[in-house]
Amino acid sequence: MASLADGGKRRVSYFYEPMIGDYYYGVNQPTKPQRIRVTHNLILSYNLHRHMEINHPDLADASDFEKFHSLEYINFLKSVTPETVTDPHPSVSENLKRFNVDVDWDGPVFHNLFDYCRAYAGGSISAAAKLNRQEADIAINWAGGMHHVKKDKASGFGYVNDVVLAILELLKSFKRVLYIEIGFPHGDEVEEAFKDTDRVMTVSFHKVGDTGDISDYGEGKGQYYSLNAPLKDGLDDFSLRGLFIPVIHRAMEIYEPEVIVLQCGADSLAGDPFGTFNLSIKGHGDCLQYVRSFNVPLMILGGGGYTLPNVARCWCYETAIAVGEQLDNDLPGNDYMKYFRPDYKLHILPTNRQNLNTRLDIITMRETLLAQLSLVMHAPSVPFQDTPSSSQATEAAEVDMEKRNDPRI
């Protein structure tokens, strides 16, 4: 295994849709696509674009979405507008409730909603296709990572599940996909989509909640291929590192994934208004650094994060990790300097929030997850069980998967 200090160069392909920052969830909505534009501007200011390939993603279309989502739901997303939601006809309110759109505060209807879905999901699907063609070692889409969306319901500020769609794309060429996430909430719908297959292993480090219990470990052929680390308030860098490194190290040894998807939700950072963890940007980035060190094809996605300047800081820093560059803590001049007042620094300090995860908690959870991994078949071989029926993967794609050569790593 490569060391944590691995700074070798990788072929990095970065996907960015220039219009992404124009989409607006509405007044008092915490999710702001503008954060992607600010992140991008900071990346340019640090000259990181000189170390990677910049791509405009292909916009996804309805046929892409239907590989996971229901046709009725996608047709609804195509037609709903801020004007139509005010229609008094009972069918309108029924559909809004049915598809969980404009019902709760985390699924508002806004102008050009479907185009927004096409943009952020297109970035993730394009990134997956880039890895499939072996044209990059690392592919990045910070606009992606909407891991809560169900087959026929919006959820968690997302409307289509680009993570599931990207993994389905990767399964056309790669035998085994390891999905890891380090955001604050559990990646419930990614786990749900692949809980009964051995072709995808999911590992989630998240706040303890209604889903993602440590006893939830998959079903059928996917039994033991879902790993969950439900953590308490105040999680700090040291505690996460003590859990993340041994668990991921063992997962890599046992499962031998051919490609990794890392969801880097920034709502696990200290000070996030909806998160109660206490991670620094460096501690968050250390997880990416460790995953990168294995030199396995890697997709990096965004996710949650509701303190805009800290999200931009974090994802810019992690872009630097991806390309193998170190950044000065003093921010360079950029178009959004006002967001970074008063210190204009890259890194943030943890708060004084108490870490409720005791040393014994971390040790116990680590040993439980390592014991679960001992029950996983070592590097399951093709033929695998079929990709979940929700993917509607084509027969041709499965044939391609069987015929492919081992990926370049």
UniProtKB/Swiss-Prot annotation:
UniProt binding sites for Zn(2+): D267
An annotated GO BP: embryo sac development
Positions with biased composition (Polar residues): 384-394
Keywords: Chromatin regulator, Hydrolase, Metal-binding, Nucleus, Repressor, Transcription, Transcription regulation, Zinc
Region of interest (Histone deacetylase), residue spans: 11-324
Active site location: H148 (proton donor/acceptor)
Name listed for the protein in its UniProt record: Histone deacetylase 7
Organism: Arabidopsis thaliana
Gene that specifies this protein: HDA7
